[in-house]
């Protein structure tokens, strides 16, 4: 049977489903299986069989329709493939989704009900985009003539063969294991920070605003012998990248990581490194190592993972930190849009808590990103470039977006981002510019753009003068898109 849509037509159809809910069989609400069936029905006018998503490769006759492929380490999924997750997902029922992008390390999918709970009426878990690290328990299914493949998450034992009516009993496969953390305790020597007199009450998770080279080892090399004057600019307890944890302070010591007396004294600060320079996959791995270290410490101190013990830097002071995690897991960028709203803050905290609890329970969680984040789109781009500082004291970084002015004129400057620079013209309400650079200077956030061969500098909000990532920004004078 020929599919009713081409691959490109089907991908476009999937994109139109985002934000909607599907209950094809009218049972148990909006399940992942319903979303797979919605796509299958569009393609063939048929419904898939199976008690749970994990049964799809076994309970259906795909002759002339599709081919089941082993998701081996060198297998590269294609857009339009269907991915089937095994029984270690979905409380034993598995999971199913449609692939729209893939590498050998991860897949980006359209899916429904990844978080569970879709059986309850009113649950707001519509179809959306998610990112999944490649797992050892998936299958892929490819449609004949369309390359929609049902991919079983990578099984490294006997190759699965759809033609076997009674597949061989699978040998037990090793369960995924957490990475082995390399914990280096080398306490800073330039100043002996005071003791708190008790265990920490919890952990504050930071993003370091560091470049690609700002690894845990790099921080160690730069800070372990740093003088007091440097440590006063900020020192956390631990720095994490890859599988390396540099412990810069003893657990009993106060840190200088929140610009707040309570946060510094009672909470252990951990920096997720490379938050400005690393690609998304690298940063997500750094996050996972951080969650694993958080789990180890909380268990050591006899503390649970909850909203009281897992804290964010922006709970203690007005800051964009943790900026990269905010973008990836809530879709909100506090660097360009201002302080993280309370609902987004709780969303981010709860994601952290869920990941940490999994490690505390001996499980290996799957990193996910918000469908509002650029990391979940088909054209993944870095969340932010590294802030740099020039000889004039201007912080700047590359960023391409459109600013649309609000209801008041703004004075545009030439030459540079200073209020003392020559006036260019009055940027009128409702006007817009496509900028390529963001700057912090002279009490304002500026964007730089070129119009008719002239470079212009436009202030778009106030800035308190604090260096990134601790800058405090005023309300935006328009909109960024």
UniProtKB/Swiss-Prot annotation:
<protein>
    <recommendedName>
        <fullName>Autolysin</fullName>
        <ecNumber>3.5.1.28</ecNumber>
    </recommendedName>
</protein>
<keyword id="KW-0178">Competence</keyword>
<dbReference type="GO" id="GO:0009253">
    <property type="term" value="P:peptidoglycan catabolic process"/>
</dbReference>
<dbReference type="InterPro" id="IPR002502">
    <property type="entry name" value="Amidase_domain"/>
</dbReference>
<dbReference type="GO" id="GO:0071555">
    <property type="term" value="P:cell wall organization"/>
</dbReference>
<feature type="domain" description="SH3b">
    <location>
        <begin position="398"/>
        <end position="466"/>
    </location>
</feature>
<dbReference type="Pfam" id="PF01510">
    <property type="entry name" value="Amidase_2"/>
</dbReference>
<dbReference type="GO" id="GO:0030435">
    <property type="term" value="P:sporulation resulting in formation of a cellular spore"/>
</dbReference>
<dbReference type="InterPro" id="IPR036505">
    <property type="entry name" value="Amidase/PGRP_sf"/>
</dbReference>
<dbReference type="InterPro" id="IPR007921">
    <property type="entry name" value="CHAP_dom"/>
</dbReference>
<dbReference type="InterPro" id="IPR038765">
    <property type="entry name" value="Papain-like_cys_pep_sf"/>
</dbReference>
<comment type="similarity">
    <text>Belongs to the N-acetylmuramoyl-L-alanine amidase 2 family.</text>
</comment>
<dbReference type="Pfam" id="PF08460">
    <property type="entry name" value="SH3_5"/>
</dbReference>
<feature type="domain" description="N-acetylmuramoyl-L-alanine amidase">
    <location>
        <begin position="198"/>
        <end position="323"/>
    </location>
</feature>
<keyword id="KW-0378">Hydrolase</keyword>
<feature type="domain" description="Peptidase C51">
    <location>
        <begin position="7"/>
        <end position="142"/>
    </location>
</feature>
<keyword id="KW-0749">Sporulation</keyword>
<dbReference type="GO" id="GO:0005576">
    <property type="term" value="C:extracellular region"/>
</dbReference>
<keyword id="KW-0964">Secreted</keyword>
<comment type="function">
    <text>Autolysins are involved in some important biological processes such as cell separation, cell-wall turnover, competence for genetic transformation, formation of the flagella and sporulation. Autolysin strictly depends on the presence of choline-containing cell walls for activity.</text>
</comment>
<keyword id="KW-0961">Cell wall biogenesis/degradation</keyword>
<dbReference type="Pfam" id="PF05257">
    <property type="entry name" value="CHAP"/>
</dbReference>
<dbReference type="InterPro" id="IPR003646">
    <property type="entry name" value="SH3-like_bac-type"/>
</dbReference>
<dbReference type="GO" id="GO:0008745">
    <property type="term" value="F:N-acetylmuramoyl-L-alanine amidase activity"/>
</dbReference>
<dbReference type="GO" id="GO:0030420">
    <property type="term" value="P:establishment of competence for transformation"/>
</dbReference>
